[in-house]
């Protein structure tokens, strides 16, 4: 049984869980196959729907997502809602699922998602991605932002992602992915879904 840590660095609750290696490998293999085929890559291009200033954003087929990932996501959304408000979710509808390929100097500006619940999972990360001469090492990390800083209340939560991290959060929670200076690919997936709010 995979551990889930649910916490609120500010108002909204955020959950972090580890993705099984089997799922990571399946997604990476599928993305590599798409990238190696120009016609598939063109059909799968999802960048026009997103704000990311990155090389490639790829939509995976519903067939692939349903077969390899959906069960894991739904299970953990149910756990997340149960831990947050102690209620059982009856309906979960996955609206979108895509993969982001981020390279040196690319970034994702501050944004929020649609749906009710969103998530991000990390599939590949360059070595020493946060390396910097600065004291605050945010290169390649993700910031979650809510409200403004006040006494005894933070407005920022910074996460330095590791391969296999999956973060679940309310869709309205603003976030940004910082650029990095290292060679290599930071590969992640994101998703949006709706739940039955009557739970």
PLM features per residue range, with description:
Residues 95-168, 176-178, 185, 195-196:
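Catalytic core of non-heme Fe(II) oxygenases with the double-stranded beta-helix
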């Amino acid at each position: 049984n995979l551990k889930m840590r649910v916490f609120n660095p500010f108002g909204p609750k955020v959950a972090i869980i580890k993705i099984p290696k089997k799922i990571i490998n399946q997604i990476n293999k599928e993305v590599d196959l798409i990238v190696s085929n120009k016609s598939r890559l063109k059909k799968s291009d999802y960048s026009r729907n997103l704000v990311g200033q990155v090389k490639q954003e790829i939509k995976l087929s519903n067939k692939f997502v349903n077969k390899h990932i959906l069960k894991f996501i739904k299970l953990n959304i149910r756990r997340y809602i149960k831990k947050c408000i102690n209620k059982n979710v009856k309906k979960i509808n996955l609206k979108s699922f895509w993969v982001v390929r981020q390279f040196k100097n690319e970034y994702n500006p501050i944004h929020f998602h649609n749906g009710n619940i969103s998530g991000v999972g990390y599939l590949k990360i360059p070595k020493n991605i946060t390396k910097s001469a600065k004291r605050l090492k945010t290169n390649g990390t993700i910031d979650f932002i809510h409200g403004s800083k006040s006494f005894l209340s933070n407005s920022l939560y910074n996460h330095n992602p590791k391969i296999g991290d999956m973060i679940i959060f309310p869709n309205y929670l603003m976030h940004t992915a910082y650029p990095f200076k290292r060679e290599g690919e930071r590969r992640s997936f994101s998703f949006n879904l709706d739940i039955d709010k009557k739970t």
